[in-house]
Amino acid sequence: CTSVCPVKIPSADVALQLRAFLDEEGAGGHPLKSKVLNWLVRDPAHRIPQAVKAAALGQRMQNRIIGVVPQAIKKRLYNPLFSGKGPEPGYRNLYEALHLERGNIFVPRSGDGAPVQENTALKEAVLYFPGCGGSLLSRTIGLSALGLLLRTGVAVILPEAHLCCGYPLLSSGADAQFASNMARNKKALQATIAGATKRGFRVTHIVTACGSCREGIERLEPSTLLGEGGGQLVHLDVMQ
């Protein structure tokens, strides 16, 4: 999107800076928000999936309750949370659906249906970063992205554990927590790429499927993930 400001003020960056300033001054919103974010960011690989499962159960219960509320009462409820049924996040996430504890590298099948063997014909691979949307909130996004990538004929590597891009932290003004999460992500992605390299794959691209993850990965500077002399890691959206 082009800038709407005639004097080219980066409105989005200014908004994030103002958000961080308000948070530093103790005016960033309800104190519970900060406590929840601080709790999640200390162990995002385990706590964010747990929180999404709890949210899925809560939404499922709310939808059942809303279903028996008389229409006359619903019309009085202006809050969309209570005026009708809401979308239910998937309870089973991408990591559970794919059983990533068994392996995080997926290779396309050859023309005769036999899997392509590692360290032979297939060398090029892409690193897919599903984020929270494609792995926790709607695993069908992640599964669809994985299927599309495999159809291009390249191997697909996923992080072994859940990684959050951290952009919700940035947009909430939690700059310090965002920086900490970004450093953790960088270390995990470098280890993932190194593990794939040892198994004979050459990672050439990092792929995202959501706008906030796109921004979070760009701030991570993908070119630094391969290390010195490792080449250039190209960042693309999955539909590109």
What do these predicted ranges mean?
Residues C1-C164, P168-L225:
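Iron-sulfur-cluster electron-transfer modules
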Residues L225-Q240:
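Short, flexible loop segments at boundaries between secondary-structure elements
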